């Protein structure tokens, strides 16, 4: 099961995204933040361990770009993806430069985000021993 952290300031989007991901993917959202400050506080806590961080770029306070930069500086192993309404070529390039593995457009790439999460879940599940059937 993927342990995820969500950085999203819209309560409606956050609620719908959590419900969708937890229904369709073996994933549990451990927490969320609606601002850069609260995201960094959560991520800075050594007891908060996650496999995936989903980041919106425009937050109630601060920027998702700064959250990505922080994750890059700390060397956290979690996969980082961006979910934004502003997925231009330039924004995608900047996010990838800050360590995002993928950038998804909220308006048309939710299915691609789900597929990405399913691939992560498949990669993180232990392989069955030789001769064992699934």
What is the predicted function of each stretch?
Residues 8:
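Conserved acidic carboxylate
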Residues 11-31:
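Two-component/phosphorelay signaling modules centered on CheY-like receiver
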Residues 35, 63-66:
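Acidic catalytic/metal-coordinating carboxylates
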Residues 56-57, 84:
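Active-site residues of response regulator receiver
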Residues 60, 88:
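The feature encodes the CheY-like receiver
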Residues 90, 108-118:
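C-terminal output helix
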């Amino acid at each position: 099961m993927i342990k995820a952290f969500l950085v999203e300031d819209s309560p409606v989007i956050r609620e719908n995204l959590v419900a969708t991901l937890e229904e369709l993917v073996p994933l549990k959202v451990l927490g969320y933040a609606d601002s850069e400050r609260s995201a960094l506080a959560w991520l800075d806590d050594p007891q908060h361990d996650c496999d995936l961080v989903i980041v919106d770029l425009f937050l109630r306070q601060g920027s998702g770009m700064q959250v990505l930069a922080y994750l890059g500086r700390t060397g956290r192993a979690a996969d980082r993806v961006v979910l934004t309404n502003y997925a231009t070529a330039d924004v995608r390039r900047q996010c990838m430069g800050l360590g995002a593995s993928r950038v998804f457009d909220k308006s048309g790439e939710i299915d691609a985000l789900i597929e990405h999460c399913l691939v992560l879940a498949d990669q993180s599940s232990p392989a069955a021993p030789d001769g064992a059937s699934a």
